[in-house]
Amino acid sequence: MAAETLAIQKRRMWIVTQVAPYSHGPAGVHRVLAQANTALSELALIEGFDPCCVSDVTTINPSEFEAGGILALFTIGETPFSTVQRTAIFSSWRSSNLGVLGIHSATDACHNWPDYATIMGARFIEHPWTQSFPIETVNREHPCVLNLPKIWNWQDELYVFSALSKNAHILLQTSPNNFDPQIAGTVGDREVFPLSWYIADPGITFYTSLGHFPEAWESTQYLQYIRGGIQWIRESLNSRNSISA
């Protein structure tokens, strides 16, 4: 029974949608949180995980993170993980017991937690542009993006990030030449802007900056892309820890 219980815990996927102070008002990701919860829960079930929707991270026992699984974060602001929770998350991530799925504004969270940037691969700086733009799929052989064309158009907030971690591998990118020149933003001398990436060392992370609008969560292409990220995290965890998800 104990081994069976542990296996169930290792298959859990926490779906954290804690966005204070952006839970009210005309702007912010709160408009799609219900859609995201539903879609991510369905994808978790399809991929063999037990979804657990969380709007208050203080309710999670840190030992649950140590058991492993996937921590899916659609967050913004100072998500109130306790010191013990942070330690458990970072340790479990580094040991590849816990994979992390970052959605959209998750890079604009936990600014007072230095290890969080290591887990995510970068920190959000600003998003001056909200527009349609062409996206280039950089590595079409990677499982996360197998369903995506080489070049495709999308409408979303265009995030500007701090320098990517050396461990982050870009999956999707766009050119600053595509940005609306009438809107000022931090372009600098960057030739490309990353939109999505993965980390495989020391821990396992898949991140996408896309997903601000309801249309994303109604898009079969977008949902298949997110499913690809979940599949890749699962298989990466399995290969390192022989976890049957």
Name every feature range the model reports, one short phrase each:
Residues 2-67:
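Aromatic-Pro/Gly-enriched surface loop or interdomain linker
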Residues 14-16, 52-53, 70-74, 99-102, ...:
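Structural recognition of the beta-strand scaffold that forms the well-ordered cores
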Residues 108-119:
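Glycine-rich, charge-decorated loop segments at or immediately adjacent to ligand/cofactor-binding or catalytic sites
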Residues 65-110:
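Short alpha-beta junction capping motif
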Residues 41, 122, 128-202:
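Catalytic beta-strand/loop cores that center a nucleophilic Ser/Cys/Thr
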Residues 24, 29-31, 104, 127, ...:
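Histidine-centered active-site/metal-ligand motif
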